[in-house]
Amino acid sequence: MIKKIYMLLLTVLGMGAISSCSDYLNSEKYFKDRLTLEKTFESKDHVEEWLAYAFSFIKNENYEVTTKGPSENSFCFSDDMYYGDRDKTIDATKNELSYNMFKLGEYDENTYNVGAWGACYKGIFQASVFIHNVDRCQEMADWEILDYKGQARFVRAYYYWLLLRRYGPVPIMPDEGVDYTQSYDQIATPRSSYEEVAQYISDEMLQATKELQYDRRTDNYAIGRPTRGAALAVRAYALIFAASPFANGNNDEYAQQLVDDEGRRLLSSEYSEEKWAKAAAACRDVIDLDVYELNIVNKSTSDNGPSERPTVTPPADGEFSKQPWPKGWTNIDPLRSYRTIFDGTILPANNKELIF
C-alpha cells in the first residue's frame, strides 16, 4: 500500500514537472514580441538608439591614452592632454596612463586597454548594419536620414582610425558583413596594408562629408555629433600617418617582417612624396571650410580679481612681439586666450577651436 502511494506521488510530481518544463520551454510568446531588423529601423527612436550604440564603443577600451580615467574625465577626445601626477618621471608608482610611456614607445600590446580590438570591430559591425538599414525609417526627413548615415559612416571609419593608430595594418571587413555560419577559412579576413587602411579611412570620411549636414554644430546638446569638419580632420590625420616614415619607405627589420598570410609587405618599402602632397591637401580642406579659428581674448589692463588680471606681457619673440593679431600678440592676452578654452568660460558650441 505504501509502495502504491509512493508511486502515485512520483507520478503526480513528474506530471507537474513535465507541465512546468513545457511552460518554461514554450518561448514562442517571447519571440513574437521581438522586433525584426526591418521593424526596428522603421522607428526614429530605435534608429537613434542604434546609432548611439554604434558610438558607444568609443568609450571604455577606446579612451584616449591621455584620458585620466572614467571618473575624472571619461569623455576626453584630446590626444595631447598631459597629467603630471600619472607620469613615472615624477612618481615611479604612477604610470598607469603616462603620456611619456606612449610618447617614448615604452609599451606593448598588453599594456593598455587590450580589449580595444574587439570593441572597435563591434562598433564597425553596428555602424555597417545602420548604414544598410536606416533608409527604412519613415519617421525621418530625407536630410535627417542622410545626416545619420553620415554619422554612422564617420564612426565606422573612426574605429578603423583608432585601430590603425594602435595596431597598424588591420583587416578591413566587407561592407555587407560576413556570414558567421560559415567556416573560419571561408570568413577569415587578412590584414590590409597600412596604406590601404589609411586610404579606406580617407575615402569613407570623404563620403561622410557628402552625407553629413553640418560643417560644425552650434547646439550644445549635439556638439558631440560628427560634422564635415570632423570627417575631414580625421581624414587628414590618417593621410599624415600614412605619409610618415613609419609607413612610407620603411625598410627597418620589423617592417620587413610585418607581412600578411601570403608574405605581402604591410608597410610600404618605397618612399612616395605624393603621400605628403595628399596629406597637405587634406589638411587644406579642413582649413578651407573656414569655420574654425583660434580663440582670442583681447589684451586687458583691468584688475577684477582672479578671473581677470591685467595681461601679462609674454617674453620677447622678434617681430611677433611688435604686431597685432594675427601677426603678433600686442593686442591680445595669450594666457587667457588659452585658459578660457578649458576653464568653462566658453561653452563647447561657442568654441571655434573644437572640431570633434
Task: Show the residue positions of the predicted features.
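Conserved, well-structured interaction surfaces
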Residues: 39-50, 56-67, 87-167, 184-223
